[in-house]
Amino acid sequence: MVLPLPWLSRYHFLRLLLPSWSLAPQGSHGCCSQNPKASMEEQTSSRGNGKMTSPPRGPGTHRTAELARAEELLEQQLELYQALLEGQEGAWEAQALVLKIQKLKEQMRRHQESLGGGA
């Protein structure tokens, strides 16, 4: 059972998922580098003239790979979010069972007191 979260609009849901770039492997570089300033410095220093120019792109393959990686990361985060919701649901069920057990113990204690009260 997944609980509806009406306050979590699509925009906010996606905003929560988009910081997923931190899930990229630490050794990866390039467009998804953890240090965009260093990436820009690499681009300008490789040109030699100090002017900011965009790196040459192939026929969309780099962009396609980037989108595929982003989609993969979003899917991973969605799975984690669903597991979190299921875990929360399980925690609520466990808490409800604990409360039921406590209530039954209290009823048993009262019943035993009423039976043993005359002795």
From Swiss-Prot:
Coiled-coil segments on the chain, per record: 62-116
UniProt keyword annotation of Magnesium present: no
Region feature Disordered, mapped onto this chain: 25-65
Keywords assigned by UniProt, alphabetized: Coiled coil, Mitochondrion, Transit peptide
A GO term from the CC aspect: mitochondrion
Pfam family, one: MCCD1
Transmembrane spans: none
UniProt protein name: Mitochondrial coiled-coil domain protein 1
Transit peptide extent on chain: 1-24
Location relative to the cell: Mitochondrion
Biased composition (Polar residues): 31-52
Tissue expression from the record: Widely expressed. Expressed in adult and fetal liver, kidney and lung. Expressed in fetal brain. Weakly expressed in fetal spleen.
InterPro entries in alphabetical order: MCCD1
Keyword Transferase annotated: no
